[in-house]
Amino acid sequence: MNNIDNLIENLNKEQKEAVISTEGPNLIVAGAGSGKTRVLTTRLIHIINQKKAWANQILCVTFTNKAAKEMQNRVMQYIKGSANSVPWLGTFHAISVKFLRRHAEALHYKSNFTILDTDDQKKLIRNIVKGEDL
């Protein structure tokens, strides 16, 4: 039994089905601590192992930095040395920024652009209003 088989063996029935069904997308909806990240990472490793896709053809997105880091650590542990590329793993925001930076020139932006959060936006507006005596 290889490493991926061990990973799959430790899943429950529904989780195994989600991992092994490699045709088309899966939507995993479950509560906190139920194993969503484990299912996603195991499925990703299984897809690469079964040669259904190259690692860099896979996009795996999550909401939290914690889950993204966990996914990256788990996947890289199993694919290092066996894959020539790395999957796109991360939060919606991180992947979007990576994509925008890669294609910034097509949008007539520099790739070192800054994204302002709400607080920074408010500060910028205040500074402009103050500087323009509005």
Predicted features, each with a name:
Residues 92, 110-134:
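Conserved ATP-dependent motor core of P-loop NTPases, especially the RecA-like helicase ATPase domain
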